[in-house]
Amino acid sequence: MKEYQVYLERARSRQQDFLYPLIFREYIYGLAYSHNWSRSIFLENGGYDNKYSLLNVKRLITRMYQQNHLIISANDSPKNGFWGYNKNFDSQIISEGFAIVVEIPFFLQLSSSLEKAEIIKSYKNVRSIHSIFPFLEDKFTYLNYVSDIRIPYPIHLEILVQILRYWVKDAPFFHLLRLFLYHFSNWNGFITTKKSISTFSKSNPRLFLFLYNFYVCEYESIFLFLRNKSSHLRLKSFSVFLERIFFYAKREHLVEVFAKDFSYPLPFFKDPNIHYVRYQGKCILASKNVPFLMNKWKHYFIHLWQCFFDVWSQPRTININQLSEHSFQLLGYFSNVRLNRSVVRSQMLQNTFLIEIVSKKLDIIVPIIPLIRSLAKAKFCNVLGHPISKPVRADSSDFDIIERFLRICRNLSHYYNGSSKKKNLYRIKYILRLSCIKTLACKHKSTVRAFLKRSGSEELLEEFFTEEEEILSLIFPRDSFTLHRFYRNRIWYLDILFSNDLVNDE
């Protein structure tokens, strides 16, 4: 990322605060090529490819400007027009350039703020994935109600471009960006389908992720302001906040107006115990207070998405549930709060009392059905969870095959060690072990029994022990109480930077 600063400083010397000239810089597409190559460990470095050259980009942009995008028919075939047969290929080139160019100024702002130790106050509550797990354990047992919310999707890309315009002032750049988005999939209509959004996100992941993150950041900035000022808000006054262009300029004035008009205390509308957690496109809203306040926030969310982001969201899509009666899914786990009831006998003099004690315990369970569905999609088992042999390359060695299965098994064990019940995790590990054995037996054109007899089943299966299991098995006997206690306890590892790939298929 350090080279970004050099390139932007070079461009700033020519034109202040403009991103459009960077689109026509050769080094931008050199960075795009380097980024694409570094994402995969299976690709060989064949040098700087001609497809990322500046000459190709200029030709594509020239053809885009020559098209009359105002009369594009919604029934035009994607194979027609200026894209020709290389539509996806050409769009990826420009998309990578757009993504890198728009990332540069925001990365520089972030790096400068970190160097000066200036953390933006409005984002002081932003945490990494590490904080979500202890949050569930420490806070959720004291809460009563929860809303499992999926951020509305899809959203029209024009809204995403408008959000970006509030932060970057460069009309030619956004004109070219709109032209690219309209030409890509005929997004000049009023309705954006999930299929078109999915196609764009897969073929242009970096640009789509950047635009989508901006959308989430914008919605959360408004939500945090509403949360901080919730004691002065009423639902009928919510539309005042939806003029986003002058939002920051009006914010202080609005606070003064609310303090003047609603000077009497409104403790009934305050909700200091509300908690908000988000990861990717899903968020959890939990509270200890009465459902009325949760219902208020539910309508805030719906009006925000409908009035400001033009995303239709119906009230019935957001349900308010009691934690003791509802399980919610987050980060690949099924979580709920279980009530443990116990009766204690108390005696005072000659009188005996029975006291019922209710304690709450957080249950975090590995979702077996979504994981089996993901393993079946990856050809490790069938839809019923029966292990099958996975097709491999003929020149793959036994060591490479075993190492590939071991990596997947250890990653899953590492990620799901925080579960309170590991029975489902052991089943997933069993599927991977047996699938590995069947794959090796199929490669050697042998049966599973004959292959295990020849290679030694015990040594092969012990390869699937995680590093923690290997260390503890050397310290404690296999049947010791300490080792069994280790298997039962939840352990969160701090080196988890993102959710497992199989979790993203949920």
Swiss-Prot record:
It is found in: Plastid, Chloroplast. Belongs to the intron maturase 2 family. MatK subfamily. Usually encoded in the trnK tRNA gene intron. Probably assists in splicing its own and other chloroplast group II introns. It comes from Trifolium incarnatum (Crimson clover). This is Maturase K. GO terms for cellular component: chloroplast. PANTHER family: MATURASE K. GO terms for molecular function: RNA binding. Its main location: plastid. It comes from the Eukaryota. InterPro entries: Domain_X, Maturase_MatK, Maturase_MatK_N. GO terms for biological process: mRNA processing; RNA splicing; tRNA processing. It holds the Pfam family Intron_maturas2. Keywords: Chloroplast, mRNA processing, Plastid, RNA-binding, tRNA processing. The keyword tRNA processing applies.
